[in-house]
Swiss-Prot record:
CDD domains: Ribosomal_L18_L5e. Belongs to the universal ribosomal protein uL18 family. Binds 5S rRNA, forms part of the central protuberance of the 50S subunit. It is found in: Plastid, Chloroplast. The gene is rpl18. It comes from the Eukaryota. NCBIfam families: L18_bact (TIGR00060). Part of the 50S ribosomal subunit; contacts the 5S rRNA. GO terms for cellular component: chloroplast; ribonucleoprotein complex; ribosome. GO terms for molecular function: 5S rRNA binding; structural constituent of ribosome. This is Large ribosomal subunit protein uL18c. The keyword RNA-binding applies.
Length: 135
């Protein structure tokens, strides 16, 4: 029997049949299925680990990364004690906005992936907005 992605996500809550990695993959695909980056509005993709956060602006039509930034960058490491804080994510969002504006990218589509729009993800988005990007 084949189920749709939404049905599988509901089954996760009821039966606990899906493994966590499969659930995360389904959730990522359900969010990404609605979002496509174009030449006019590329996609800002976010990856969060326990220690750091990474973001890249991607043009999906040519499948190329236009701008990349992470909390491992030297400027951000010097200004914050570690990459786990919301302040580091906010600084990274501002730096990402500066780099993208240099490449004439002002309008983007935000792809939060499987993560909730909360905490470090929200701080990154707020920093990018403060830097001049439009979502």
């Amino acid at each position: 029997m084949k189920f749709s992605k939404r049905v599988l996500l509901r089954l996760k809550n009821k039966n606990k049949k899906l493994k966590p990695d499969k659930y995360k993959k389904l959730k990522r695909e359900s969010v990404r299925g609605l979002i496509k980056g174009t030449v006019e509005r590329p996609r800002l993709s976010v990856f969060r680990s326990n220690e750091n956060i990474y973001a890249q602006i991607i043009d999906d039509t040519t499948a190329k990364t236009l701008v990349f930034c992470s909390t491992l960058d030297r400027d951000i490491k010097l200004n914050s004690e570690n990459g786990r804080t919301c302040d580091a994510s906010r600084l990274m969002g501002q730096k990402l906005a500066k780099l993208s504006i240099k490449k004439n990218i002002t309008k983007i589509v935000f792809d939060r992936g499987p993560y909730l729009y909360h905490g470090r993800i929200k701080a990154l988005a707020d920093g990018a907005r403060a830097g001049g990007l439009q979502f």
